[in-house]
Amino acid sequence: MLSVLSINYRYYLMELIDFSSSVWSIVPALLAIILAIATRRVLVSLSAGIIIGSLMLSDWQIGSAFNYLVKNVVSLVYADGEINSNMNIVLFLLLLGVLTALLTVSGSNRAFAEWAQSRIKGRRGAKLLAASLVFVTFIDDYFHSLAVGAIARPVTDRFKVSRAKLAYILDSTAAPMCVMMPVSSWGAYIITLIGGLLATYSITEYTPIGAFVAMSSMNFYAIFSIIMVFFVAYFSFDIASMVRHEKLALKNTEDQLEEETGTKGQVRNLILPILVLIIATVSMMIYTGAEALAADGKVFSVLGTFENTVVGTSLVVGGFCSIIISTLLIILDRQVSVPEYVRSWIVGIKSMSGAIAILFFAWTINKIVGDMQTGKYLSSLVSGNIPMQFLPVILFVLGAAMAFSTGTSWGTFGIMLPIAAAMAANAAPELLLPCLSAVMAGAVCGDHCSPVSDTTILSSTGAKCNHIDHVTTQLPYAATVATATSIGYIVVGFTYSGLAGFAATAVSLIVIIFAVKKR
């Protein structure tokens, strides 16, 4: 029998069914994911998962389910007496939509594409440009996907690179890079978790940041995902449905080209607003982080600022600053009329409505998945007598499954890192860091593939690509790297060597690529 779990919300108290020990906990997420891929109708699929999850948690009482769902939706906007931080992401999306429309109406997108066309040699150069920008924008995955999308999209469009390929490049260089960088929103969060785990198990041979760096070198999925992106960009390694999208783009039959205006734009009108966006966002991240450190009486440090930064607020400030600069440049050029300028705001806001709707639905189902305790159920699967040699690969697969079903890598970190540390510290201390690395890799892999993940949605948004097109074209590449990564972690489990695991992953990936190319 399923027990009853009491959850105390600020605005209401209701009894929810406890699915933490039941396979039924995965039903809402699994239903939404299967329907989304099968029907290609994301909102309908997410709605089905949301409704079924609400009914299951409410013991199939329609009135209770409706009340639960309404309160959850309200909490996305307003919670604990203040506006939810999620609204900053929504506002930033709207600002980015407006900025993109302003860049288009001013002719700067067209000017930048023409400028790049004279300097970038072919489609390969356009794809490599999009991939290389991660070395500038690695501070946050949201920021990377949206900012690089705005910069690279005019260029990839001009060279007839499909939007699906651009979305793949954005997504596969976002979280994989952020998760390995200490000076990023991801790195700061993970280092904080690691510090607590090292203290819990009295491990003194590593500092938290030292352990993080060592773990990053064994995060095979993240490392080889980035390598795969550059390989795909350089050699045009197209597989599965990506082949069709690239052919359509080359024939110019994909609905992807931005509307071009008759305005003779200038390259500076794109470069300056984007530079301001990057500089203002990073500066605000440092400021909000430093302010939080000061409030807690802590000494300023770069790592500390990124650990305590407020990403949403920083993105909004950066967005406003970039729009102000873009507007000033438009005024100076005197080529855009007031009605055209106003229309650009309307067009920009409308362009983000679909992405915002998907985000709200994804956030709602993520709340339901949390109340279903899907993560707790999946984590319970690692209990029992597991051969230590297979522990890293098991944790990788389980972390991927959890992040895929819940749509959150950070939530997976919070649940699985303590479990991995407990198992490894007690049974095989030599495998502690490899096991933690495997969890990080699995979380990024699952988040990377999940159609309900924020980062997947925002990568589609940044590329202005159909969301399910992005999911289905990226999945074969992610599965290829994940397969090679699994082999690498098996080797680590038997050899206790991160270098051996790295080599095994590299060799496996090469073999898989050659096997796929021969088909």
UniProtKB/Swiss-Prot annotation:
Keywords, ordered alphabetically: Cell membrane, Membrane, Transmembrane, Transmembrane helix
Statement: the UniProt record of this protein carries the keyword Transmembrane: yes
Keyword Chloroplast among UniProt keywords: no
Subcellular location: Cell membrane
Alphabetical list of InterPro entries matching this protein: Na/H_Antiport_NhaC-like_C
Primary subcellular site in the record, as a coarse category: membrane
Disulfide bonds: none
Mode of membrane association: Multi-pass membrane protein
Superkingdom of the organism of origin: Bacteria
N-terminal signal peptide: none
This protein's name: Uncharacterized protein HI_1586
